Amino acid sequence: LVGSEMCIRDRGKAGRKKPVLFPKIVFLYDENIHGKGKISEDVFEAGVDCSAKTMYPDWLSMSGKGYISSMYKQYGKVISPMGCRAFLSPWYERGGMYPADDKDVPVFVGRFNIGAVSLHLPMILAKARAESRDFYEVLDFYLEMIRNLHIRTYDYLGQMRASTNPLAYCEGGFYGGHLKPNEKIGKILKPMTASFGITALNELQELYNGKSIAEDGQFALDVLKYCLLYTSPSP
């Protein structure tokens, strides 16, 4: 079935054969299933061929290294990407942001992101130079602006009544969504995330010293680490 889906997708639309982008497909690659000589190697090959023609499916490695694969290996949980290829951070059943103990498990199904606001990093560097200010001082201003926008969004959404979307908030469509129609939804928003977006790292590096991130990505990496530290919650 999956192989057939790949074949249908890479043919494109009738007529001009234009690639079909929606609905998006994500291929969950498991080396033990899709690797060389494994039972579904042919499905993997079909996926590669489809990606070469249409840029989809997106790929997630369940047997590699990193956040996505570690959650799969430890808990058997698949973290599906949202539309912009962003991923939900874990929320544990009993402990919330952090596991209560080694038996606590993360929840991803039924959760959502309330919104994303992206940093235009080259613009921030250009602004800092034009105003003769420290880059990180200007970056802090925009990071705090995004944080405040997200807080405002949480507060605004929290005042909405469950009756605005009964399927999601009253019938369990969203995680914790078993409210009465007249209840405010703020009480179930805590497991939901808000995103700080990052754009144009390569252009940032080129503006910084005229080199791409392939030639010298240190400044871009430093900025990324800085943003990650800023947005990381304290235990």
Regions from the PLM with identified roles:
Residues 55-199, 203-208:
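Structured mid-domain segments that build the active-site/substrate or prosthetic-cofactor binding neighborhood
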Residues 5, 146, 150-153, 223, ...:
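Hydrophobic alpha-helical packing residues
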Residues 1-10, 230-235:
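Conserved small/polar residues in nucleotide/adenosyl-binding loops
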Residues 47, 138, 219, 223:
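Short acidic-hydrophobic sequence patches enriched in Asp/Glu that either
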Residues 4-5, 9-86:
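Conserved, charged catalytic cores of large soluble enzymes
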Residues 16-22, 157-170, 216-218, 232:
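Short, glycine/acidic-rich hinge or "gate" loops at secondary-structure transitions
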Residues 1, 5, 95-99, 222-226:
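A short linear-motif detector with a strong N-terminal bias
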